[in-house]
């Protein structure tokens, strides 16, 4: 069996060294020393000013909305994981969808201003597959209309735009450290901001809104993460370069094998680095996608229709709206297996099946 993804695990002894320390200290959670160390190490690795390690990427988005005091409409993308939209609704705000760019698959920055109303308070955009949005144009729009900007950077660990971490754009960026991600802490998330006052507010929100032994400053949540999760994050961090290099090598193997596939790749931001978080292909038709997926399934090779269906037309708690580009792309995009342990021989096998179905 070849899964669509498989978590990277460090050598067991490296993880257990951290676990021995947890056992000795008996400090399991509540901003323990490993969680604090992970925050410091990640700030250095990612070259960001301020960062918090939290429960997961979804809670990170919810905390970001809360910290920025957003209560109205939030312009967002219908082509993302459901947590992007559900977090908006969970916080009592209204998502306003804007169609995506057919090349980058990120929110189309040229269409954002048409969606702005007197109720608009923020833009929440996703760096799809780690491919950065048009962060410069979005920043210009936000300044012009006095809007907050949150980036769902769940896929964008390690990516840089114009030599700067993609996490440093917007008021807040959030990242997922779920085990399916290229860098993970089993479960986990990050909140990144350049604003020290906002960081202080987010830290309080993460800890139930507590500001001292006997006082509260915010409406808070339990957004903390445990020492066990921090241990996995620390153990994995030293392997990130090897993980990146291997995923790049495997992606290039796909490129070589699939040069005659009736499909196109995502057009990457011209000023951004790649982290090879996913290998998506946009096939020429949904019919071809379904045939390929069915044959791969029969051979126990599992792919993912990521993201399908469109969030704007599929969520039971929102009015259904169809956006032509999102509807089209979501029906034709397929993510192929990509993970550290995948071999080039397995990729050759996957690609032979794909091309056989296409050419028959």
Task: Go through the PLM ranges and name each one.
Residues 1-28, 337:
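N-terminal "arm"/small-domain region of PLP-dependent enzymes with the aminotransferase-like
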Residues 27, 31-73, 79, 87-90, ...:
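Phosphate-binding glycine-rich loop
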Residues 33-41, 45-51, 110, 114, ...:
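PLP-dependent aminotransferase class I/II
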Residues 52, 75, 96, 149-150, ...:
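Structural detector of well-ordered beta-strand residues that form the stable sheet scaffold
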Residues 66-153, 160:
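PLP-dependent aminotransferase-like
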Residues 103-104, 130, 181, 284, ...:
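Glycine-/small-residue-rich active-site loops that bind phosphorylated ligands and cofactors
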Residues 151-185, 212-217:
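Conserved active-site segment immediately N-terminal to the catalytic lysine
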Residues 168-204, 227:
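Active-site PLP attachment segment
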């Amino acid at each position: 069996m070849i899964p669509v993804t498989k978590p990277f695990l460090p050598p067991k002894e490296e993880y257990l060294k951290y676990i021995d320390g947890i056992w000795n200290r008996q400090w399991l959670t509540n901003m323990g020393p490993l969680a604090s160390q992970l925050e410091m190490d990640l700030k250095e690795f990612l070259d960001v000013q301020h960062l918090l390690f939290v429960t997961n990427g979804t809670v990170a988005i919810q905390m970001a909305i809360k910290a920025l005091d957003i209560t109205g409409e939030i312009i967002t993308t219908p082509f993302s994981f459901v947590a992007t939209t559900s977090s908006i609704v969970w916080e009592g705000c209204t998502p306003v969808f804007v169609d995506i760019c057919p090349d980058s698959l990120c929110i189309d920055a040229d269409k954002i201003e048409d969606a702005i109303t007197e109720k608009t308070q923020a833009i929440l955009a996703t760096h799809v597959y780690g491919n950065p949005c048009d962060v410069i144009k979005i920043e210009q729009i936000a300044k012009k209309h006095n809007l907050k900007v949150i980036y769902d950077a769940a896929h964008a660990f390690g990516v840089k735009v114009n030599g700067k971490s993609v996490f440093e754009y917007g008021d807040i960026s959030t990242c997922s450290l779920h085990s399916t991600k290229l860098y993970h802490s089993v479960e986990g998330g990050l909140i990144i901001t350049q604003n020290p006052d906002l960081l202080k507010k987010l830290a309080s929100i993460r800890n139930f809104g507590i500001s001292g032994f006997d006082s509260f400053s915010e409406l808070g949540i339990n957004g903390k993460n445990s020492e066990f999760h921090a241990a996995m994050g620390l153990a994995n961090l030293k392997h990130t370069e090897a993980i990146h290099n291997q995923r790049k090598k495997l992606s290039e193997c796909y490129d070589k094998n699939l040069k005659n596939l009736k499909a196109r790749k995502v057009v990457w931001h011209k000023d951004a680095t790649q982290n090879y978080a996913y290998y998506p292909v946009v096939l020429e038709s949904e019919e071809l996608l379904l045939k390929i997926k069915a044959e791969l399934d029969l051979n126990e090779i599992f792919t993912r229709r990521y993201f399908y269906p469109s969030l704007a037309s599929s969520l039971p708690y929102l009015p259904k709206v169809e956006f032509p580009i999102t509807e089209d792309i979501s029906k034709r995009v397929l993510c192929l297996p990509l993970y550290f342990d995948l071999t080039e021989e397995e990729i050759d096998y996957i690609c032979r099946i794909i091309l056989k179905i296409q050419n028959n």
